[in-house]
């Protein structure tokens, strides 16, 4: 049985008597602390497995496409292979087969901490294996070693106008980091395509290492009068270094950041940012260009700005209704929002049909660390009322809260009130998932993405409809 097969079986067995054995098997799948060495062992096995699968089932149909799907943003079309995570409508996201609660239980934590380290999740996403503390420690130190920014990127960030949106700065700086691309250099020198993944791995590791420095510099320049981000401490984990560079020293905020960066990392391959990185990467654009393109998608109001919209709506609600709000007044406000043609931000999801587990774990964090915060109480009250109102309205396929309904409130509580910046945090996190997949896309030799497009007249002719 392959290591990746073990990771797929483990979650189904965690509740059984064999749970301990499976967890031990997954944890001990590889003793090496060097991620590239582990990958070098996994890649040929996965290549062989997929080759055999395609030989046997390559011509097998996996579904039908309707006209509504074509006009509806390709919702429900099974058209991508994405290995690192799968989104179940009822269970929510699973990272390499593991649910968020399982990741919280199994992934290594910082000394004295309770939330999983994002390094551990990245190892899991790349390998399918639950890492050891030693493997996570190696990754923390490796990213610290690779974190320094080239001088031209620092100069660029320092000279951006203050009215340029943080996401525009983030994307531009990532594009400029392409000067450091090992993959672009190797490709120009004619490297064998069997080795593409090795250089994509190096670029991805470098980029993930540098993103907190880029993000922190943007934050300091815009909101802290350009003060220094300080130096990376190789003895600290990735999230701890990030919060230090941002200027936040509260241990609970660092714990929140570990949780935030873990749960926002990946959400299967069809969302805008993940699909964009896959699409651009399929042209053999290097990871810097691919990820920068993904961030331009994440900056869109329909993708990464939702948590900001939640806070704007909550603030307006507080301003209109005052402090303590009765359930009846809350219901009336929600109905007024809906009747005006607007939606309740933070509720509903394109795929999910239950409460987003990413919302649930943030709610649990808030119940433990800030149960009396007025804004959290408001969010908790909405959780009790909004789903019933949406069900009563009868339009929503999913009346339950998603991840965005909670994250902004937590950040505000610890003093990060700059809402325009929140999507940058989302972007730092999303790198873990899409870059883990990008490495595998090159390792598995995925081709240039080129779906067939059709005109409306062509579709009408295809289904036998009259044009006009």
From Swiss-Prot:
It comes from the Eukaryota. One of its GO terms (molecular function) is identical protein binding. Oxaloacetate binds at residues 358, 430, 450. This is Citrate synthase, mitochondrial. The gene is cs. Its main location: mitochondrion. The active site is at residues 303, 349, 404. Citrate synthase is found in nearly all cells capable of oxidative metabolism. It comes from Danio rerio (Zebrafish).
